[in-house]
């Protein structure tokens, strides 16, 4: 890798590996990046469902302005609005959900009405009246739809300031019957709120109209229902009395959160966290990390038990990995009984082949996970010896670029082993010029080294290999490295776990299209459309959500 001409001798991130203009959008080429820009798939959309529609004339006899919102039962509207109320029975205004119609004092206007869906639409049919006539189905501009309810099927959404574009694959919301909370909106009694909902059926919390980005579900516009602290559905929320196809019931006790125009993802699982201070917890939450797997220094059992109690009030999932520091019978059992979610083998406490073998045998017998930080001194074993000790059993190998510790300089060779699940940490992703420099201080600080001791500096510098750092991105792109975590309070920062993962996906999009990737196995369908990176984004999101959850045995609960 060469340096740029104006910085001789310096390494630039992936310099020369991608074209100067790697299919960037017009906004990026002009320097005017529109954060979260949306490319609309249509110019307009039909309003609401295909139901009976009529129009009638309404006159305001009041001395005051009267407004009626979209889903208010028109037949029950202000008595000083004069119109054929029998004809309006079972209908509501045919306008966007959450909008309203205004009548000035004395004003008369013709309005369109649409029949309610659900039970109301079926049970409260009234005969046609001479005061009404059929009305066409109105349309709403795609721009207004986006402003009110967020993107819909086929729309493309840019992730932040990256060159990654999501394509909305499906819209499960109730078009025309959206639950919208606020002044004059639809999430009220007799509208999208089901007043007779039972406690067992109504949601505790509704996240309405979010763009769900999930490695399993895909990219779906949907309402998210929460009950008893768990997500119980991703679908269509509302009141079955007035809307069709409702599978998530909004009741009088449901707390609404408006997700229109927002992205909802699974909470990230940071599977390498040194939890040495509670100050990490708000940082994790603010950055989208909701599950922490600690890095294995939480023993003795008394401390583990007290730690779990102390963290009980935090809205986070905490898994304490215990340090596997001895293969003496009975010691690991004590840690499991104290609440350990798994074990961590670390070179600072010994990563000998016989210890690796014993701990993996114990983990297999007790169905728990093991994470591994290998012997960087080569004091007891080299890479091949560690692989032999693992013997085809499943283990999670941390920071395989080697800078965080482990066999030097060839730790990355672990990616060849099918049973070894490799991860890398945020401070080297995506690779940049400051990464090698930063890690000299990091390694000394976190591993008991001293600047004044030449031997300590020599050990540190032997660990830092810019070439393996630079190789991490392409190996992630090929799937050889499957997890991103932070090594917070060790190598990295918990506030960067999600952000660095997405930045890596962005960088690798450019690398994949550049000359450095020629001859590398590709994903052809993904390369066809520069405005559809959906599969890439889902793959990379899995690296900090689903994949670590599976590896640590908690995917039934999180990820």
Protein language model regions, located:
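Asparagine-centered strand-capping/turn motif at beta-strand->loop junctions
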Residues: 56-64
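Acidic, glycine-enriched loop/beta-strand segments at the rims
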Residues: 213-223, 535-541, 549-559
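Short acidic, flexible loop segments centered on an aromatic residue
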Residues: 65-87
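Terminal connector regions
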Residues: 110-136
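Active-site core of metal-dependent hydrolases
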Residues: 345-538, 544-552
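Intrinsically disordered, low-complexity Pro/Gly/Ser/Thr-rich segments with frequent PxxP/GP/PP motifs
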Residues: 83-119
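Divalent-metal coordination cores built from histidine and acidic residues
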Residues: 135-196, 235-236, 246-247, 251-265, ...
């Amino acid at each position: 890798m060469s340096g740029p001409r104006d910085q001789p001798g310096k390494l630039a991130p992936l310099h020369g590996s991608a074209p100067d203009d790697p299919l960037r959008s017009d906004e990026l080429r002009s320097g005017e990046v529109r954060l979260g820009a949306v490319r609309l798939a249509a110019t307009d959309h039909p309003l609401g469902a295909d139901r009976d529609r009529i129009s009638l004339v309404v006159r305001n006899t009041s001395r005051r302005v009267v407004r009626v919102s979209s889903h208010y039962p028109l037949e029950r509207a202000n008595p000083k609005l004069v119109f054929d109320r029998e004809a309006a029975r079972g209908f509501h205004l045919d306008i966007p959900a959450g909008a309203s119609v205004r009548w000035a004092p004395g004003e008369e206007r013709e309005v369109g009405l649409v029949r309610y869906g659900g039970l109301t639409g079926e049970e409260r049919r009234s005969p046609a009246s001479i005061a009404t006539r059929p009305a066409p189905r109105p349309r709403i501009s795609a721009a207004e739809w986006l402003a009110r309810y967020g993107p819909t099927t086929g729309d493309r959404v840019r992730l932040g300031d990256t060159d990654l574009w999501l394509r909305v694959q499906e819209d499960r919301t109730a078009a025309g019957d959206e639950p919208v909370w606020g002044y004059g909106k639809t999430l009220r009694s007799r509208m999208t709120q089901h007043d007779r909902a039972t406690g067992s059926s109504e949601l505790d919390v509704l996240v309405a109209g979010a763009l769900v980005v999930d490695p399993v579900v895909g990219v779906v516009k949907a309402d998210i229902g929460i009950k008893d602290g768990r997500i119980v559905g991703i679908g269509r929320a509302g009141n079955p009395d007035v809307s069709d196809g409702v599978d998530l019931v909004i009741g009088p006790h449901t707390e609404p959160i408006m997700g229109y125009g927002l992205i909802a993802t699974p909470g990230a699982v940071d599977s390498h966290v040194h939890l040495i201070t509670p100050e990490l917890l708000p940082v994790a939450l603010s950055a989208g990390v909701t599950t922490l797997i600690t890095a294995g220094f939480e023993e003795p059992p008394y401390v583990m038990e007290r730690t779990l109690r102390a963290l009980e009030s935090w809205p986070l999932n905490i898994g304490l990995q215990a340090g596997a520091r001895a293969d003496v019978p009975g010691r690991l059992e004590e840690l499991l009984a104290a609440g350990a979610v798994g074990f961590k083998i670390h070179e600072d406490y010994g990563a000998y082949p016989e210890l690796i073998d014993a701990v993996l045998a114990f983990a297999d017998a007790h169905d728990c996970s093991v994470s591994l930080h290998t012997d960087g001194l080569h004091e007891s074993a080299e890479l091949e010896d560690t692989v032999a000790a693992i013997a085809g059993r499943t283990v999670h190998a941390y920071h395989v670029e080697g800078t965080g510790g482990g066999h030097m300089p060839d730790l990355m060779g672990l990616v060849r082993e099918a049973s070894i699940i490799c991860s890398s940490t945020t401070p080297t992703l995506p690779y940049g010029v400051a990464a090698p420099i930063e890690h000299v201080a990091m390694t000394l600080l976190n591993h008991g080294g001293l600047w004044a001791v030449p031997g300590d500096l020599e050990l540190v510098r032997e660990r830092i290999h810019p070439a393996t750092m630079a190789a991490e991105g392409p190996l992630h792109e090929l799937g050889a490295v499957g997890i991103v975590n932070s090594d917070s309070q060790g190598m990295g920062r918990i506030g960067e776990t999600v952000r660095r993962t997405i930045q890596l996906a962005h960088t690798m999009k450019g690398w994949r299209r550049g000359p450095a990737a020629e001859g590398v196995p590709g994903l052809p369908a993904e390369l066809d459309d520069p405005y559809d990176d959906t599969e890439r984004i889902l793959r990379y999101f899995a690296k900090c959500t689903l994949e670590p959850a599976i590896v640590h045995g908690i995917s039934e609960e999180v990820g």
